[in-house]
Amino acid sequence: MTTQQIFNLAIEMGIANDFRPRIRIEKHLKRIRGKYEKLPKDEKKLFDKKKMENPYIDSGVHFDAGIKNVKRVMVGIDIDSAEMMIARYLSNHNPKKEIDLVIAHHPIGKALADLSDVMHLQADVLEQYGVPINIAEGLMKIRIDEVSRGVNPINHFKVVNTAEMLNISLINIHTPIDNLVAKFVKTKIDKDQPEYVGDILQSLLQIPEYREATKNGSGPVLFTGSPDNRVGKIALTEITGGTEGNAKIYEKLAMAGIGTIIGMHQSEEHRKEAEKAHINIVIAGHISSDSIGMNLFLDELEKKGIEIVPCSGLTRVSRVKNKK
């Protein structure tokens, strides 16, 4: 596989596991293409045409060294210049097993600058859980603007420049990976049908990545509520969609009948608002959840004979081997 083919596989898996129906994603891309066609000629030159084809613009191919048959990839949750240097070091010291591609999860380069563009996904998910779309979009717009301003001053291309100088291909896969773990956890919870909040924690602890995280002090934890509380209606609104949404959404979710939310991570401001709304918050874990999603994708690469070198917080669990 080439670097681009690996990236395309990730995007397709992201679409297949998106909480939104495929037709909704296709309509979104069609709408962007329509807006592009109406732009003046000068503005078209500045427009990122990838936005018309890639529904997850917080993910991208940042540098492609042109390797036609990727055999070995180094994969981490966060990739910076240090990890790129490690990839070059490993390649230099073992030329027969060079690192052909480095894969990051969290956004870098242009994907980081565009992080807020994928957050519209959250409004669609909130609507599925009973929040009127006008309220979901209104609250999300405020938060999207905040995130856009927040990432604006960051040195987005630091690690991308390093990849170019070292001549090592670099991509990142963010929302597609988050979609994978969101669907995976939802399937697990739907199967187990927990009655009490404590049952959710026990269900999550049956997943290898969460068990390992617990050993390391960062396993699933209850942020609000009690293990003895009944779960009510469960929502997975804080696993995919870029980053945290608007803290004011919990009141609306409670009014929509949501009793428990399962998320990756949560700020103190969001926790307090959820507590006011009497919603149980189960935090599965950030890096461990990212590892689950990444592992589900990496299993597909492993099936194609690509060797995986985990780094930077990735807990590698191969479900391909477990099926044997």
Q: Can you say where each PLM-predicted feature lies in the sequence?
A:
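Active-site catalytic microenvironments in core metabolic enzymes, especially phosphate/sugar-handling
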Residues: 1-324
